[in-house]
Amino acid sequence: MATINQLVRKPRVDVKKKSNVPALESCPQRRGVCTRVYTTTPKKPNSAMRKVARVRLTNGFEVTSYIGGEGHNLQEHSVVLIRGGRVKDLPGVRYHTVRGSLDTSGVNDRKQGRSKYGTKKPKDKK
């Protein structure tokens, strides 16, 4: 343990926490334009074709963003909203696109967990 004299000479320094989503610059979401929409494969042991988009943000950053849900309408030059949140089995993907905002449509025929996929409440058929 340090003596009081040592602490007077050289005080304790707080460890700065590094952000997991630096491109957001402390904002909850950011707007951007898709520069490329493509599919990629996850790390072992998983197997799929994951839908991702390369997005140029309004602050100049270019990031890779995951497109969640079944089916999407994104193409090059689509304007999207991205939020933080990584995809564990896709290296380098630290952001998610927000479904149901700007040019991104919500997921069709979704009944549960709709708020996460930008889907409106279905009309009751009686």
Swiss-Prot record:
**Compositionally biased tracts (Basic residues):** 113-126
Write down the InterPro entries for this protein, in alphabetical order.
NA-bd_OB-fold (IPR012340), Ribosomal_uS12 (IPR006032), Ribosomal_uS12_bac (IPR005679)
Q: Name one GO molecular function term.
A: tRNA binding
Q: Which UniProt keywords apply?
A: Methylation, Ribonucleoprotein, Ribosomal protein, RNA-binding, rRNA-binding, tRNA-binding
What processes does the entry annotate via GO biological process terms?
translation
Pfam families, A to Z: Ribosom_S12_S23
Q: Kindly list the positions at which 3-methylthioaspartic acid occurs in this protein.
A: D89
How it assembles, according to the record, is: Part of the 30S ribosomal subunit. Contacts proteins S8 and S17. May interact with IF1 in the 30S initiation complex.
Q: What does this protein do?
A: With S4 and S5 plays an important role in translational accuracy. Interacts with and stabilizes bases of the 16S rRNA that are involved in tRNA selection in the A site and with the mRNA backbone. Located at the interface of the 30S and 50S subunits, it traverses the body of the 30S subunit contacting proteins on the other side and probably holding the rRNA structure together. The combined cluster of proteins S8, S12 and S17 appears to hold together the shoulder and platform of the 30S subunit.
What family is it from?
Belongs to the universal ribosomal protein uS12 family.
| Protein name (database record) | Small ribosomal subunit protein uS12
